[in-house]
């Protein structure tokens, strides 16, 4: 008789661990008695049609359906192999694992009550042949630390944005420094601006209009090349104003103010890039402080006092130093607030006005202290 009920093939490519039966009488396999079949070669080909009928089980009633197997491609469930000592078999328990659930009709037999599937030497117990396909699947790379969610394209765009902002800022500061140098060291120019004060108000009007357009018109400041044209007009007008203010101070005071401003701004920018503290979360406090400083400036117009002006200039320099730290962190993109890479003109404008205000307040402190 064919040994069709020896094992079930339903995704398992491994033969049963039992060796072939030796010749001679075969002891019955409890609780089901198999007809002796000497010299049966193992493993048997699965589900081969057999010319022999399948007898029922002679030993008592069984909770499992009896009778021969129908001839057809119906997979049968595996029989649990209990730890029964057999003649010709190695003594020991043979735990038989449950078969993986596949897209095949399953046997009505109860699942195997025994533990883990059998693992042959040299095989990985975690391999798919010995695992549960219902719980296993392709590895997910979304939660894998080896595949972070950081987009390298975004990083490169952000770095290019920072380089562009500092390039524009460098050009602006170069124009302003050149203008201040001319207004400070050339006596003819210094005398002209002192005699024609009205040019200061004209440049202030041009600066104010350019500042309003670039600050309030988002579409305009992102439209190339008009955004650069407006920024150039603003830089030229503000440079003229700064140079005219510097012409009313001593040359020594102007040089000291330039040096102190350079040191302060460089330190603040480096610190803002390296620190973990988020200065952008303090934007509301800085705006309120700006309103208070504006009221203080109106008070200084009507009360002409040297000490009061030094205090006002000190508070203004401190406030715009904080604004410089905030505007620097807005470029990085890893804080609570950040600027879009398209806003390089607006970012350069913020940094430029911060540095110019720091310079003017420091120049006021030095000039009033020397009087």
From Swiss-Prot:
Disulfide bonds: none annotated. The chain crosses the membrane at residues 165-185, 197-217, 228-248, 253-273, 283-303, 307-327, 346-366. Keywords: Membrane, Transmembrane, Transmembrane helix. Coiled coil: none annotated. It comes from the Eukaryota. GO terms for biological process: apoptotic signaling pathway; endoplasmic reticulum calcium ion homeostasis; negative regulation of endoplasmic reticulum stress-induced intrinsic apoptotic signaling pathway; negative regulation of extrinsic apoptotic signaling pathway via death domain receptors; negative regulation of neuron apoptotic process. GO terms for cellular component: endoplasmic reticulum; Golgi apparatus; Golgi membrane; membrane. It is found in: Membrane. Residues 1-145 are annotated as: Disordered. Its main location: membrane. Signal peptide: none annotated. It holds the Pfam family Bax1-I. GO terms for molecular function: calcium channel activity; transmembrane transporter binding. Residues 84-98 have a biased composition (Low complexity). It is a multi-pass membrane protein. Residues 14-49, 102-114 have a biased composition (Pro residues). Potential apoptotic regulator. Belongs to the BI1 family. LFG subfamily. This is Protein lifeguard 1. The lineage of its organism: Eukaryota, Metazoa, Chordata, Craniata, Vertebrata. The gene is GRINA.
């Amino acid at each position: 008789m064919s040994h069709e009920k020896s094992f079930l093939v339903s995704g398992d490519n491994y033969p049963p661990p039992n060796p072939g039966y030796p010749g001679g009488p075969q002891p019955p396999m409890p609780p089901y008695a198999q007809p002796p079949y000497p010299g049966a070669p193992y493993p048997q080909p699965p589900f081969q049609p057999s010319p022999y009928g399948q007898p029922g089980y002679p030993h008592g009633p069984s909770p499992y359906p009896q009778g021969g197997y129908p001839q057809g491609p119906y997979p049968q469930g595996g029989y649990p192999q209990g730890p029964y000592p057999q003649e010709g078999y190695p003594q020991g328990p043979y735990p038989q694992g449950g078969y993986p659930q596949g897209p095949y009709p399953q046997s009505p037999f109860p699942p195997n009550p025994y533990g883990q599937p059998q693992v042959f030497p040299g095989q990985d117990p975690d391999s798919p042949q010995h695992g549960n396909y219902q719980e296993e699947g392709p590895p997910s790379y979304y939660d894998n630390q080896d595949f972070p969610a950081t987009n390298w394209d975004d990083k490169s765009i952000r770095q290019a944005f920072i380089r562009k902002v500092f390039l524009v800022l460098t050009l602006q500061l170069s124009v302003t420094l050149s203008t201040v140098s001319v207004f400070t060291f050339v006596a003819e120019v210094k005398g002209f601006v002192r005699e024609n004060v009205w040019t200061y108000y004209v440049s202030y009007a041009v600066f104010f209009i350019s500042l309003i357009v670039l600050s309030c018109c988002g579409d305009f400041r992102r439209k190339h090349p008009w955004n650069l044209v407006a920024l150039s007009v603003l830089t030229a007008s503000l440079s003229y104003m700064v140079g005219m203010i510097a012409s009313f101070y001593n040359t020594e005071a102007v040089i000291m103010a330039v040096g102190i401003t350079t040191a302060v701004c460089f330190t603040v920018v480096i610190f803002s890039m390296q620190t973990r503290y988020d200065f952008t979360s303090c934007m509301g406090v800085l705006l309120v402080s700006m309103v208070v400083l504006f009221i203080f400036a109106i008070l200084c117009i009507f009360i002409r006092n040297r000490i009061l002006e030094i205090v006002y200039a000190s508070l203004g320099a401190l406030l715009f130093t904080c604004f410089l730290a905030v505007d620097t962190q807005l470029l990085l993109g890893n804080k609570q607030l950040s600027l879009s890479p398209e806003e390089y003109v607006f970012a350069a404008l913020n940094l430029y006005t911060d540095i110019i205000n720091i310079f003017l307040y420091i120049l006021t402190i030095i000039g009033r202290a020397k009087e």
